Amino acid sequence: MKLEHPDRLMNRTPLSLAALETHDAFAERHIGPDAASQQAMLDTLGFASRAALIDAVIPASIRRAETLPLGPFAQPKSEAEALAALRALADKNQVFRSYIGQGYHDTHTPAVILRNVLENPAWYTAYTPYQPEISQGRLEALLNFQQMVADLTGLAISNASLLDEATAAAEAMTLLQRTGKPKSNVFYVADDVLPQTLEVIRTRALPIGIEVKTGPAADAAQANAFGVLLQYPGVNGDVRDYRALTDAIHAAGGHVVVAADLLALTVLTPPGEWGADVAIGNTQRFGVPMGFGGPHAAYLAVRDEFKRQMPGRLVGVTVDAQGKPALRLALQTREQHIRREKATSNVCTAQALLAIMASMYAVYHGPHGLKTIALRVNRIAALLAAGVKQLGFATVNDTFFDTLTIDTGARTAQVHEFAKAKRINLRRVSDTQVGVSVDETTTRDDLADLLDVFAQAAGGTAPAVDALDAGLAGVAALPAGLERTSAYLTHHVFNRHHSETEMLRYLRSLSDKDLALDRSMIPLGSCTMKLNATSEMLPVTWPEFGGIHPFAPAEQTVGYREMIDQLEEMLVAATGYAAVSLQPNAGSQGEYAGLLIIHAYHASRGEGHRDVCLIPASAHGTNPASAHMAGMKVVVVACDAQGNVDIADLKAKAEQHSANLAAIMITYPSTHGVFEQNVREICEIVHAHGGQVYVDGANMNAMVGLTAPGQFGGDVSHLNLHKTFCIPHGGGGPGVGPVAVGAHLAKFLPNQRSTGYARAEDGIGAVSAAPYGSASILPISWMYIAMMGAKNLTAATETAILNANYIAKRLAPHYPVLYSGPGGLVAHECILDLRPIKETSGISVDDVAKRLMDYGFHAPTMSFPVPGTLMVEPTESESQEELDRFIAAMIAIREEIRAVEEGRADREDNPLRHAPHTAAVVTANEWPHAYSREQAAYPVASLGTNKYWPPVGRADNAYGDRNLFCSCVPMSDYA
């Protein structure tokens, strides 16, 4: 509905309260173009209404007949109403003091980081830094993360984050399989590794033929394993000296992975110093709330020899066109978008925002501050150990950092009962033992309460904390010889921003370098960079969501589970499937889970031999990478000249592999930005040969309310809540990748048996460390759907399609639109073909992308799915004014190219070849170019009042990969 001017409302007969309330509709905030703008764009396209456009774009055979069946959420709520409804759910959660440990710990998020990173759209609305020149701020923050991890682990190089500790362990396993002992398929897991980690490892190992063995760490060298996973400290708190064991494993031809607690490594000898080949772990306790399991940034660090086999993203240092230091994503040829099924991993989205928070926690506290925190945590654990021993209890582990396992015998139930009365959670190790993991937030009063719990169970009086402290001088809880002596975090960045003033300014200086949605549209095709509304983001930092341990008792998480159930029902309605799991914490993991579900279904029918996965040539790189991880053989299906699946080739491949056909993976609308007319036929062909249909949900933003994969033949899909359902991209994560399935596949959805979470009868194993994955950001999608309601969600989809077609129509005279459906229409994105321009002018798609930075825009998706093209997706959130600004920039760039084609500009010395132009270059004393400074920096008038300056010139990618350097840069290099 178009907002009316208040004066007009005042001059009419008074409106009803209901009519006035519609003027606070959230949809009017979320959808960019108002009614007048939409009609103007429709007029440009030659349609009388949005409905007429949609009828022409989407095949009638797959149109949804009914309104989205959202039940109680069909009618939109105002922002205030939705927040109140979610607050009521949050209040059903009980925030206990959780000393469960098991990889998750309460922590203090420094307020300066909470407000200026987690709650700051300059950080959370940015995209993955594939365009380095406009991403230098978050690249520096991620480089800090890598330096922090490398220093603390004592290893050569770290990646820029993975999804969670369990996933990182599984990635380490497959890394060592690729590089290690050729005659072994055994991966050995010590029996004191986190149970959720072991379960994810088992899930990942099964389809690729790895045998997982478990047992005492001491037996690892005799296991004939290509790799061994050790926990340091162990889940029960033990800190063991693994130096001799590591030497023995190496002598036997194996490699060693260590799951290490980074805070503990400030006081313990790092694994890199005693022979570990790989270190993995979670950085959650560095200032990131527990959030019922996530999101958190995992890490993976390796010895130098493994750096080119690392999974995930890697930030490296290079130089720009002026020879100044610049940062970029390094060694991208390892990744799925390039190597497809041969990639080191299928991970696309990681946990950039959380990695940035963890790195800034280290920057803010510095090495001395971190060590002080660690020593205090260790001291509290030591006092607790002394106290429970005075009360007559024995500790299982004599060495520890922060975790005690306590023999409580027949009094175990009493201990838990008394703890519950004080709103305390302890780990239920067994019927005779409890675990206690203290943390940064544990106070003297908390310690007194813990001692009182054990005193009540023992029928005694708790010793006083001060008396314990006075009597425990000089007692060491760390093994002799394992105290850390090496320096860490010596780089200046970790030693200068310890006042809040300095930290605030440092964060501001970094965010000012970057281009995010808070500055301009980001028209990345297949990425759906839509509004992340502030009201959607607010609940993420509520303690009732952030302060919950993922393994807290069910009665403490009633509100969470109710919200999750409602969100699952919303997604079922949107997709047309029967059931959804929210456990996968990225689209890549939802995709992987979907393929495992298909395999489990075939196996349950005695057809476990079905292992062929058909994938169109145009598919996103995660598709073949995930299929390979799921143990499937990839067979490529050709696409025709229009970009559609070649039906004849599909029939031939399906017939050829009929006996072994497991699935086809298709994207809808297609990766070419078109609603293929024959999608039902594609599904029917595969079903006829016994296969299942996997519909990639990356483009769900073009389907919500209009069509549904579960209704036109899909059996399983993953969704990207960080695309369609408004979770922000965070500069490269977090994401959520739910897997949605038909009724016949529902019983195979992911479980997590190690923690008692089992929702599916024959469910596959866990694919994430926590039962509900990145649970604390699920309220974002819940809020979006609740505030939009059924009709407005459909209107958003229609507007996304309208915006894309408007751009395609306006730019078609200047750049050919490569693929379109009937009537020359596209779906929610369009592909602009720049290949003819390259032939006539020498200007590349990369040149255009860099030149767009001078105009204040992030480039569209480059060279996907077709090399030499730009894929543009504007989303429904961008206004016509912003679309016109982008169109004007693209037309102006085309005229600059035309000047090269006609000889009016030099083929080498022109504003495209030297883009982007920094302020330092434009204001330098010397100007060596034939074109003017004004043309370089202010090519259109609108930039005069709103200019973004790229902080570096064009990054030299080849130099960065040839001279790989992935640590913080000395200040002298910036001189």
Swiss-Prot record:
Keywords: Oxidoreductase, Pyridoxal phosphate. Gene3D superfamilies: Aspartate Aminotransferase, domain 1, Type I PLP-dependent aspartate aminotransferase-like (Major domain). Its EC number is 1.4.4.2. Its cofactor is pyridoxal 5'-phosphate. The keyword Oxidoreductase applies. The keyword Oxidoreductase applies. Pfam families: GcvP2_C, GDC-P. One of its GO terms (biological process) is glycine decarboxylation via glycine cleavage system. Signal peptide: none annotated. NCBIfam families: gcvP (TIGR00461), PRK04366.1 (NF003346). The glycine cleavage system is composed of four proteins: P, T, L and H. Belongs to the GcvP family. This is Glycine dehydrogenase (decarboxylating). It comes from Burkholderia cenocepacia (strain HI2424).
